[in-house]
């Protein structure tokens, strides 16, 4: 299965109101502080590339979520300043970033060089505002795949509905020209009669969505996440991009221990 990884701010991470309050740390939604998690699920999304082969995939996650250190298959982050309950927390993190595709991923990229996802090193600041959190970040490619950076701000608001926790979120991000051009640009040697050469500049994207966490018991839970991303014109004007409007819907089952 060819997997297209969308660059969205929201990841499908578990939460459970029976065992712990849902909380935001280092720009992520967590529960079960101090426990391990094993998680499986699936997601479907809008096509990012024109004539894309697949726009769905399985989701697997495993890791440990601690007080300051969190490490799982989505990345590693560490809070180095501040404590739970403080207005400001600062953290650093490593995370996967970008879009992986080759010429077999979509008809629109036939004959183009393979693009690879990368690993970014970033800095994060969480600012607590009651039940809400403003989370800012800056991250840069450390493997020299796209040689670019991303920066942005997200707002999360934790709502306790009794049986479930609801976390609406919204944000804005900026992707540098190096980032956008690597993934969505078309080199002169890749141009065809149907696919013109294209250089993508830096641009903003906007996202909003929600995460719903339903605890079955103290160990098991079900989560459902939906998000919408509006891509900037420097990305959507690319001849290989399908649409500015990107939707993602996913669900997971998680076990905490």
UniProtKB/Swiss-Prot annotation:
<protein>
    <recommendedName>
        <fullName>Outer membrane protein Omp26La</fullName>
    </recommendedName>
</protein>
<keyword id="KW-0472">Membrane</keyword>
<dbReference type="InterPro" id="IPR010583">
    <property type="entry name" value="MipA"/>
</dbReference>
<feature type="signal peptide">
    <location>
        <begin position="1"/>
        <end position="19"/>
    </location>
</feature>
<keyword id="KW-0998">Cell outer membrane</keyword>
<comment type="similarity">
    <text>Belongs to the MipA/OmpV family.</text>
</comment>
<dbReference type="GO" id="GO:0009279">
    <property type="term" value="C:cell outer membrane"/>
</dbReference>
<dbReference type="InterPro" id="IPR054915">
    <property type="entry name" value="OmpV"/>
</dbReference>
<dbReference type="GO" id="GO:0009252">
    <property type="term" value="P:peptidoglycan biosynthetic process"/>
</dbReference>
<dbReference type="Pfam" id="PF06629">
    <property type="entry name" value="MipA"/>
</dbReference>
<keyword id="KW-0732">Signal</keyword>
């Amino acid at each position: 299965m060819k997997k297209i990884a969308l660059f969205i701010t929201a990841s499908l991470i578990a939460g459970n109101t029976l065992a712990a309050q849902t909380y935001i740390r280092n720009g992520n939604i967590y529960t079960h502080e101090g426990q391990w998690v094993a998680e499986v699920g699936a997601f479907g999304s809008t096509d990012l590339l024109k004539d894309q082969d697949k726009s769905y995939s399985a989701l697997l996650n495993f890791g440990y979520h601690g007080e300051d250190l969190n490490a799982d298959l989505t990345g590693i982050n560490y809070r180095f300043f501040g404590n739970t309950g403080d207005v400001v927390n600062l953290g650093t993190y490593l995370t996967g970033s970008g879009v992986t595709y080759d010429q077999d991923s979509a008809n629109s990229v036939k004959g183009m060089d393979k693009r690879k996802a990368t690993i970014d090193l970033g800095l994060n600041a969480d600012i607590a505002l009651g039940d809400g959190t403003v989370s800012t970040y800056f991250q840069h490619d450390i493997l020299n795949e796209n040689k670019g950076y991303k920066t942005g701000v997200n707002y999360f608001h934790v709502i306790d509905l009794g049986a479930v926790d609801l976390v609406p979120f919204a944000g804005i991000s900026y992707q540098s020209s190096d980032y956008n051009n690597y993934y969505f640009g078309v080199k002169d040697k890749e141009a065809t009669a149907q696919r013109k050469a294209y250089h993508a500049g830096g641009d903003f994207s906007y996202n909003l969505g929600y995460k719903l966490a339903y605890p079955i018991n103290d160990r098991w839970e079900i989560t459902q996440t939906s998000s919408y991303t509006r891509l900037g014109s420097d990305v959507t004007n690319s001849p290989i991009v399908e649409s500015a409007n990107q939707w993602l819907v996913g669900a997971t089952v998680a076990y905490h221990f």
